[in-house]
């Protein structure tokens, strides 16, 4: 008897919308996070902000800086809860080597894109990115405005019919 394919639900905790506006995302990877217990509890309440976070490669390990996980009020007082501590990303050695090659290119960086639950574990989607120029951002805004206007007119035409 064949096994049924289980649906994997991606429960998103936090987005970094600004990253896709500021950077061209060339490739995305899924990385695990090394967290403490109080951080997991805070993530269950979505008390996290990855808007100003960034990823750095240091001594063949990858770390997440600047992610703010607010501690819950019910966290015990004997635990030192630092909301902006550095968190290690869990990746294979092969993936780290690929990232290292990409980062050595001029203008390349790693950006945290999305934080989500998968099978009870917290995962971070990171993107290998290059910065956009201001004219690229203007072009994206024009395209987005045009798409919005197109949808609006189609909706009006369909409403009249």
Swiss-Prot record:
* Keywords recorded for this protein, A-Z: Cytoplasm, RNA-binding
GO biological process terms on file? trans-translation
Cellular location of this protein? Cytoplasm
Which Gene3D superfamilies would you find in this protein's record?
2.40.280.10
**Signal peptide: which range, if any?**
none
Give a GO molecular function annotation for the protein: RNA binding
UniProt-listed SUPFAM superfamilies: Small protein B (SmpB)
Is Nucleotide-binding a UniProt keyword of this protein?
no
Q: Which CDD domains match?
A: SmpB
UniProt superkingdom = Bacteria
**InterPro entries recorded:** SmpB (IPR023620), SsrA-bd_prot (IPR000037), SsrA-bd_prot_CS (IPR020081)
Q: Name one GO cellular component term.
A: cytosol
Which PANTHER family has this protein been placed in?
Answer: SSRA-BINDING PROTEIN, TMRNA-BINDING COMPONENT OF TRANS-TRANSLATION TAGGING COMPLEX
Q: Which family does it belong to?
A: Belongs to the SmpB family.
Q: What does this protein do?
A: Required for rescue of stalled ribosomes mediated by trans-translation. Binds to transfer-messenger RNA (tmRNA), required for stable association of tmRNA with ribosomes. tmRNA and SmpB together mimic tRNA shape, replacing the anticodon stem-loop with SmpB. tmRNA is encoded by the ssrA gene; the 2 termini fold to resemble tRNA(Ala) and it encodes a 'tag peptide', a short internal open reading frame. During trans-translation Ala-aminoacylated tmRNA acts like a tRNA, entering the A-site of stalled ribosomes, displacing the stalled mRNA.
What is the name of the protein in this document? SsrA-binding protein
The organism is Vesicomyosocius okutanii subsp. Calyptogena okutanii (strain HA)
């Amino acid at each position: 008897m064949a096994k049924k394919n289980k649906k994997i639900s991606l429960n998103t905790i936090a987005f970094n919308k600004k990253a896709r506006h500021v950077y061209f995302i060339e490739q995305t990877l899924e990385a695990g996070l090394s967290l403490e217990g109080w951080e997991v509890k805070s993530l269950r309440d979505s008390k996290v902000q990855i808007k100003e976070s960034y990823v750095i490669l240091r001594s063949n390990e990858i770390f997440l800086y600047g992610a703010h996980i607010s501690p819950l009020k019910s966290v015990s007082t004997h635990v030192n809860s630092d909301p902006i501590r550095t968190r290690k990303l869990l990746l294979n050695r092969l993936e780290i080597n690929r990232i290292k090659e990409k980062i050595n290119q001029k203008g390349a960086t790693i950006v945290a894109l999305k934080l989500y639950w998968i099978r009870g574990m917290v995962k971070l989607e990171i993107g290998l990115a290059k910065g956009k120029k201001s004219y690229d951002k203007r072009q994206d805004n024009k395209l987005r405005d045009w798409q919005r206007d197109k949808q609006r007119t189609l909706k009006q035409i369909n409403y009249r019919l």
